């Protein structure tokens, strides 16, 4: 029996052997056995409730911080878009956003509604679902600072509403169960002038453009900093990478950026194995020279191929 034959009837769309490299910013990797595009939350709920437990399920957002391995992704890859990308301004300077909404579009929706405090999202690549899962942030602000309610579905299709305290957020991490699929959230801001908000957003964008290789095929920050923001004498991943000769280090078509050496770059010819090898080589150097274990911030999913060494997947 084929995988598709084992899946429930849905209102959304299934695509067999779906190419994924075009759905990620690094532009590498093999196909999904099946790609599922749910019509809405109830459609996704039914899919989860009726899909056999032994079939792997993986969620893919904008693919901004995801490396799909060359062997492709087993089971079903779920991509949240359409109905999951909506935003809505609420009373009390709150904003509701679907998990498939791009972070920068949420920032713009908040600005238009005169809701301040969410402008940092314009500097965070990816979608709200990823921001919720990894407590994404930039420039001394993170998602846990502004989220007040999270909506998710578990692997059985049950709808869950959770508070930030229940998720026990910490630096680039949350304690939500791995099988939860975030479908949306509510954010709390404060009254502010839309023009003033937009000015701050433009400053964040300009800062990123001068310090990060955002025009390249990259996945953003490769490794989380060893210490959270505010730590005295905070150790930063880029400084550690630079200290071991990682700036510009290359394997095949993959290298660490000369502009910001915590950014992996695909020059257009890299394989997923090249990119992962560059990261692992530099991690090994940092471990050997500084006795520090850098933690992947890039989420690596799928099967390895050929002789590529299997590493633990990180979110």
UniProtKB/Swiss-Prot annotation:
Pfam families: FAD_binding_4 (PF01565), MurB_C (PF02873). NCBIfam families: murB, PRK13905.1. Its cofactor is FAD. Residues 214-236 are annotated as: Disordered. Belongs to the MurB family. It is found in: Cytoplasm. This is UDP-N-acetylenolpyruvoylglucosamine reductase. Its EC number is 1.3.1.98. Pathway: Cell wall biogenesis; peptidoglycan biosynthesis. The active site is at 172, 221 (proton donor), 297. One of its GO terms (cellular component) is cytosol. Keywords: Cell cycle, Cell division, Cell shape, Cell wall biogenesis/degradation, Cytoplasm, FAD, Flavoprotein, NADP, Oxidoreductase, Peptidoglycan synthesis. It comes from Maricaulis maris (strain MCS10). Its main location: cytoplasm. GO terms for biological process: cell division; cell wall organization; peptidoglycan biosynthetic process; regulation of cell shape. The gene is murB. PROSITE patterns: FAD_PCMH (PS51387). Signal peptide: none annotated.
